[in-house]
Amino acid sequence: MKKLTAHLLVAWFAIFVSQVSADDHQGNISPAASTGQIVLVYHWPCADLNRGLSVLRDMIAYESANSPHKYSAVPAVHEDGALASIDVHGSQKSMDLAIVWQEKDETWQSYLSEMASACGSVDDLTVKALEIN
């Protein structure tokens, strides 16, 4: 009986160790985006950051409910204190279609104007586009 218990204990320990090792190498880091997606990182120095963030959150909620082109977006604050947004589009084409929609949508444009009143000139808004490989 002691021998069987010892073998079971060793077998259980071996399974546990192999599972812990497998867990150490699987699932710790998941991709932030997939191949072919476009990630946009917006940066806008903002005089009234709290108001800018509030308007940006409202804008993202509006986009989520109304954009005919699916993408994800999240508000953020850049390390230098600027207002930021990170958008992930499924493809270049999807991004282009979303931009056309934004340019034509009056409500979206009003959010942009409201952010400009909180943050300053739209000319100060910059964007970095990353194509995921």
Regions found by a protein language model. Give the residues of each.
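Short S/T/G/P-rich N-terminal loop/turn motif that feeds into the first structured element of a domain
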Residues: 19-107, 117-133
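Non-heme di-metal
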Residues: 111-112
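Positively charged n-region of N-terminal signal peptides that target proteins for export
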Residues: 1-6
